[in-house]
Amino acid sequence: MEIKEDVKYLESHEWFKKEGNIGIIGISDYAQSEMGDVVFIELPEVGDEVTADKACATVESVKAVFEIISPMTGKVVEINEELLDAPEKINEDAFGSWFFKVELKGESSKLMDAGKYKGLCK
C-alpha cells in the first residue's frame, strides 16, 4: 500500500494536493484496494461548487457504491475525463488517477498528514 508524503488525507480515504490556489482530489491506494475493481465513476461538472466534508462524487466497484467526500471548498475547474471512460485506472494508479481540480476557497479542518493516515490504515 502506497501512502504519499506530499498529499493530505481525510479519514474517509480521499487525498488532497495543493498546487497554488488549485486543489487536486483523488482516493488513496488503501481505498482503491478495499473497494475492489472500480467499474464506474461519477464526477462533478466543471463549474460546480464543492464543499469541504460533503459528498461530491461516487465510485462504483464490484463490491459497492462509495461516496467521495470533498477535502476542500471551491469551484471545479477541471475533471479527469479519462476516468469516465476507464475507471479501472483508479485501481492501477490511485495517485495518478486524480478525480478533479478545484479553485480553492477553503480546506477541511479534518485533513491529516501521511504519518497520521498511516496509523489509520493499520
Curated annotation (Swiss-Prot):
Domain of life according to the entry: Bacteria
PROSITE patterns xref list: BIOTINYL_LIPOYL, LIPOYL
CC annotations in GO: cytosol; glycine cleavage complex
Cofactor note: Binds 1 lipoyl cofactor covalently.
Lipoyl-binding domain residues: 22-103
Disulfide bridge map: none
Cofactor entry: (R)-lipoate
One GO BP: glycine decarboxylation via glycine cleavage system
InterPro entries with a match to the protein in the record: 2-oxoA_DH_lipoyl-BS, Biotin_lipoyl, GCV_H, GCV_H/Fam206, GCV_H_sub, Single_hybrid_motif
Record's keyword terms, sorted: Lipoyl
Sites bearing N6-lipoyllysine, chain numbering: 63
Family to which the UniProt record says this protein belongs: Belongs to the GcvH family.
Subunit (UniProt): The glycine cleavage system is composed of four proteins: P, T, L and H.
Entry function: The glycine cleavage system catalyzes the degradation of glycine. The H protein shuttles the methylamine group of glycine from the P protein to the T protein.
Name of the protein in question: Glycine cleavage system H protein
Species whose genome carries this gene: Treponema denticola (strain ATCC 35405 / DSM 14222 / CIP 103919 / JCM 8153 / KCTC 15104)
